[in-house]
Amino acid sequence: MAGSQLKELKATLKAHGLTGQTNVKKSKKGKREAKKYDHEEKARTIAKIRDRFNPFEVKTTKNKRKGGDPGLLNSDRVAVGKPGISKQIGEEARRRAFEAKKLMKKRKGGVIDKRFGERDKTLTEEEKMLERFTRERQAGSQRKKNLFNLEDDDEDGPIELDMFGNKLTHLGESLSLADDLNVQAEDTEDLEEGQPQRKKTKLEVMKEIIAKSKFHKQERQAAQRKLEDNIDELDEDFDDVMAELMTTQTLKQDDIEVPAEEKDYDIKVKELNLEKRAAPADRTKTEEELQKEAEERRQKLEEQRLNRMQGMLEDEEGEERGVEDLDDGFWGSDSEVEEGENIANSDEDIEVESSSEEAISYKSKKLVAISCPQTHPEFLNDLKGLSLLEQPIHVKAIIKAYQPKLAEGNKVKLANFSKVLLKHMIYLANQRYDKDLIKFDKTQNEFLIILKRLSEKYNQAISEVSREYILDIQERFKKQNFHALNNGDILFFIIVGVLFSTSDQYHLVVTPAQIILCEFLEQIRFKSLKRIAVGSVLLRIILQYQRLSKRYIPETVYFLQKALLSLVVNPDDIESDMTLPIRLDTFDCGLKLKEPSLPDDAVVHLHELFTKSTTNEEDLKINVLSNLFEDLEKLIGSHWNNEAAFPEICEIFEPILSVYKVRYPSITTVESIEEKIKRMKKLNKHYPLALQAHRPTAIPSYAPKFEENFNPAKKSYDTDVARNEVNKMKAQLKKERKFVMKELRKDTKFEARQRIDEKKKEAEAYHSKMSNIINTINTEEGAEKNKYEREKRLRAGKK
């Protein structure tokens, strides 16, 4: 039979040297032995012994490492936790959370609206407002009634009144404690007569202070009311008093004699006041300094243009920004507009020479007033009676009369007028001006100069109207294709190239305009000579846009190839074996002359493109062909020469040039273009495309890997990393959800136990209270019963 737990505990403690005989005599000469256990080791040993004798309070697991204390039972197991203590800690935490939640119950959740009728759905808004107003006035009148009541000594509370306003009494005596207090006060006053004056209490002092403050406040309000009455009386008599003052004769200034010295002094003081304050004058700069500043300014502007061409912008702080960072600052700030104030009133730009015949005829006409038209119909109405050459003079007069510094709002008017001027130039281009071609050119050039000056100041307004017009052109082109274009559209694209910076990588007006020009070159079917002529004009405009940036435009290559082939191919070539690289829209535009000669100054006039002109068709072909060869030579010499694909681009035109050379040897431009291509190819460094050079990497070789404890149920061997991570996250989420649900169940059970305990305590308190009441009643009834019995016995004994 095993021994008791106490004997085992004593034996274990003695075996570890924790108990036993401690009064063993030691030799004095011998050295003191070191303690067998230090404090930490002793504490660990005691903890192990305690855990051994309380096996159900410690959660253990098998020790993977061999070795243990042979003196202890189950020393090969390791403690991993104490469920009892953990449970106790969790219970304490839940109890604290429950108490905090119970304290905050009914203490949060917003504001309770106690206004009258707020929760009554039967009342309208007017009824609620009326009732609230009535109650507020009643409360205010009650406060004002007792505000200055100096005889009101009832500080303790209101007097009890019945429904008729009478004081409540019982058997003729008042229920208020004030009467009893007054009686007691009278008795104390009688007793205190003849005694020295006592010190006032704090309550009496405060009552006196309140009474005095009420009295003084009433006095101040009375004085204020009296002052306001006097002011009102003076206001009523103000007109009469001023009338009396105006009738009095004042002494004239001329009648007063002022000495000459004082007059001179006053004049001198006024001159000094009107004179500008002295300021240090700028030093006169030499011609070298002025040239240097101008050169620095030009270099700075060129640097800014190059940055915009590369797609980089700089803000005021010098930080570079990309095209995507454009904001409202792109238009220019108000300060920049104010700096350009002198553009509108520049004499050299707006004033007309007196010797001009148009200016003299314009001044001779009687104009009542110059208005600043805000729409194009208004402007056309103002131009009635004016010749074509007088219109620019009228425009200059409008700009001079509506300078921004002359009146407020002129800046907005001139901004709108700049839009009207652009529309008017397009309107004039769409009119028939064959007979007045020289006057038309002169007028449009003057308008363009004026619009250029206005665009420097009103850039945003002109940009907005330009973008709107580009959208209008695009919509018309979608519906009617080539028939939607007119002279005004061509002139508009020319004006855009003059007004705005065409070298920018992205521009709010130039970029959309160039996109739609390329769309024209690609989508228009060039099935007639006039269409090819229009395309050559559009090509010249695109080259003008790219004169500085020199970007490669694929649509120009496509149009040049198609136009040159259309002008060299004849209907007879259809039956031959001639192969064409692209599909042509017509075969009727080829040159019919055997030895054509290209002029040096070939010009294609706009008025000949969209009207039935009498120009010879062969002359128009020669002019168009001359322009095309000139554009091709310019592209090869200045635009495409820096491209890495220069040989591939020129391969498109080499067979076409060879055909022209064979059929029309009189065209010497072809030979010069071929020589230029050969020379450019020699200078061009063409490197084929290649991948980036990397160091060769060795193919990794892996030895086969074997696992002794292979178990796919415990470890995932999926080669897909993404799916493996997803499964891992799902498992972790499942584990966390399970843990949270477990904690929620524990919290719910704990709260249920706490509520049951509270209900039990309430029930016990209630029952104990009721039992106490019943016991008290029974005790009193029993005492009264005994008393009654005694009295009954006494009465019976007397009988």
Swiss-Prot record:
Residues 25-34 have a biased composition (Basic residues). Pfam families: Nop14. One of its GO terms (cellular component) is nucleolus. Belongs to the NOP14 family. PANTHER family: NOP14, NUCLEOLAR PROTEIN 14. Component of the ribosomal small subunit (SSU) processome. This is Probable nucleolar complex protein 14. It comes from Candida glabrata (strain ATCC 2001 / BCRC 20586 / JCM 3761 / NBRC 0622 / NRRL Y-65 / CBS 138). The lineage of its organism: Eukaryota, Fungi, Dikarya, Ascomycota, Saccharomycotina.
